[in-house]
Amino acid sequence: MGTCVVRGRWRAVGGAVFRVLAVWAVSTLTMLILAGLLPDFRIQSPSGDSPTTIARTAAIGAGAFGLLSALVWPLLVRALLLVPAFFLGVLVFFLNGSMLLLALRLVPDGGSEAGPETAVAVAAIMSAVASATSTALAVRDDGAYRRRLRRLAHRHRPGPRRTGEDGLPARPGILFLQLDGVGFDVLSEAVSPRTLPGTGRVLPPVMETVASWIESGGHRLSMWRTDWSSQTGASQLGILHGTNHDVPAFRWYEKETGRVLVCSSPSSVAELQRRAVERTGDRGLLAEDGASRGNLFSGGAQQLALVLSVAARRGRGIRSRAGYFAYFSDPANATRTALSFTAEVFREIVQAVRARMRGDEPRVKRGGLYPFIRAFATVVSRDVVVAAVIGDLFAGRTVVYADLVAYDEVAHHSGPHSRDAQQVLARLDRSVRLIAKAAAHAPRAYRIVLLSDHGQSPGRTFAEAYGITLEELVRIGCRGGRSGSRPLAGRRADREVTGAEARAVARAALHRVDEEEKETRRGRGAGPVVLGSGNLGLISFPELPGRVSREEIERRHPALLGTLAEHPGIGFVLVRSEEYGPVVLGPHGGEHRLDQRVVIGPDPLAPFGPEAEDAVRRTAAFPHAADIMVNSAYDPTTGRVHAFEAQIGSHGGLGGSQGHAFLLRPAELSPPVPEGEILTGAEAVHRVFRRWLAETEAPGAPLSPPAGGPGERVG
């Protein structure tokens, strides 16, 4: 047996040496070809050299570049943790080119030279070729492939291991992978075969890997219903920390402090997490050997990467950005992501121009910084989170929760069912496949749970559909009142042009952690504060303490509530009555008294389904519910709503697919709810996940799901 072990080690060493030599040879050949093609790149003296000398120079230069990439690059990236990560993609090219120039100076002949711009291009090409060669060689060897994935993730020190009699972990781990904003309807379409219009040709599903899991019976798909505030802040806080009490919207005004809390501000989400932990007395879902990757909240995990709630604290903020180092310390990864980032920027510009030329409707502006925000969400954030998750799998962590925000960002501006969004889903499917392959090589079995935090509902913006913003509508309603005050903040909400989750990650990467909160901070006595959270609007009167009653609003602004409730773009209005408690007002004099369960006239909540009553009643009891809460109109036949932000795919309120998230669980886990029932509320999802974690205590759990689609060989 000892002889077999020795032979195996020598075989591994021999294979590693062969791969190093092969990559070196390919890099040398690449340098020779580029020297022949690029006029500003020379690896011979001006007087000319023999072919042997040129080849030797190329080999030395390629070898020096490879050594510098392996030894110096990780140190540079660690230093760059002090630099805003958003600029890392630009610095990648400059630093890579600088290392190539240094490598050429190390060549003894001294005849090699390259212009700065040429050095950047040559370094990028050589890094990409070396990475592709190394990957191609490693794919043929399971051991090498496993080591390749480990290097991809640059895993940290492994967490605690629990071993059984056979030396393997006695309990499987669980990976919760959140596909941000992918509604139940969107996922159902993405895992179904498609028919090419006009030809009848059947195409494979957009998400082939996920479809294969369902088709094989290894996973079961179900829907879960969100709270009224159908957005990541409320959903993820409830899922990770067990409560989303007093989170009425994506952004809301708190009178006692004069602040607007926003679920994309690090200081705001840190405060929400503190309140949740204080309320539950529990650190969170991930407290036991867990990892939180790309999320708004930590979930109590000690292993963090791109977690917004710790970004406001500089000391831990640097630590939370260690995920950047874990990925970008490989120069090939850095180059590939930087190139993909650039390509994604141009892809968005081209897609936006095409949409305008086709006259697509509805449509929102997609200029300014948006192409860069989209590229950050669909490339940088995705790559870093996926690498961190793979590192967690190889570290054998007990539970991992990660969020991929790419789809949500694109769907906001291109539409939930657009071709642009489908392309993002296909790329997310490839990320899921890569993670599943890594799980197959991990030191413990893993159960992979896919879920979303909400869906998205399509529709023209409120401003586009009716030629007026919510802020302007409130102003009209206030004109007949005694105060004659003018709202402050509604225009800002209507001008919002970027997806909240992606913008939050990008802001943290730029170290602009509190800019949005500073912009939305308002003093007392300045008139109503009007905010938009998707198709949910909030109106607060800062000069009046506590929750202002319906009767007081009607005394001060007699026309306001009627103006809002009777507008065709408004579905219903929630206020608090001194006599009846929470009351929902709607068109044609409709009124729904929630505490008494009494409806007068047409029920304003009827178009939103039977579950709307409980959802609105729960939010009405929140201490920081706005004085007036407004939900846009909803068309049940088309599923369309009207966002109070510049988004044609929106979420945050009631109406349509935005409130229908999905849950895809391994068949071995117990059903989330009894058959015929629908899981409702993020807090209920937390309880289900707790139960599933308890179920994994039993030994002998099945292995992770297969990584590929039908017919794909795994392992």
How does the language model describe each region?
Residues 170, 184-325, 329-333, 482-542, ...:
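Active-site nucleophile/metal-coordination loop of metallo-enzymes that catalyze phosphate/sulfate
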Residues 141-160:
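Short, highly charged, low-complexity non-transmembrane loops/tails of multi-pass membrane proteins
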Residues 379-380, 384, 392, 400, ...:
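A long, amphipathic alpha-helix that forms part
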Residues 139-144, 242-415, 538-541, 546, ...:
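His/Asp/Glu-rich, glycine-adjacent segments
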Residues 264-271, 275-282, 286-289, 293-300, ...:
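Active-site neighborhoods of enzymes that stabilize oxyanions during catalysis
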Residues 1-121, 132-137, 141:
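Juxtamembrane/disordered regions of integral membrane proteins
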Residues 241-254, 318-321, 422-430, 467-486, ...:
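Acidic, His- and aromatic-enriched active-site or binding-groove loops in soluble protein domains
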Residues 429-466, 583-585:
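Metal-dependent active-site segment of extracytoplasmic phospho-/sulfohydrolases and closely related
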